[in-house]
Amino acid sequence: MLPSPNGSTIAFALADSGAQVVGACLRNAGAVARWLAPKVADGASVVVVPAGERWYDDTLRPAVEDLWGAGAVLSALVAELESAAGASPEARMAVAAWGAVALPEDLLNAASGIELADAGFIADVEIAAQHDVSEVVPVLVGESFRDAAALPPPGPRLRRVGS
């Protein structure tokens, strides 16, 4: 698969802020949603960032496929939680965009898909267009993503009471 420099930059910036970072895409949207659901049910907040890319002049280039990926994860999360309560307008629009997409055709005809196909990466685009074919939930640990299933369970969250 092809790397996402902008996605990597965002992932590391979020991790540096103390957030737990999970890699999600069309291929693992359901698995990520199932992993997130109990955390959200326990009160955790979720931020889904459709990273986009950068133009050659370093300005942001939105990527519709990242919006679809965000919508796929959020749609699956809503289904897991059986509620869209608290979803932002942006989250609801991502879910709507996901509901409107026709894969793989739309991805192959999107600007990024055409660009990658023209560069000889059509097989990568076709793989990226697959939905819910992976159960891997990649969690950023240090400088690499690791499968959440292979990580030790988190310890209890302790806080100091009094002095």
Where are these regions (language model features)?
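Internal, conserved structured core segments that host functional sites
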Residues: 2-60
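Long, charged alpha-helical interface segments
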Residues: 5, 14-20, 61-163
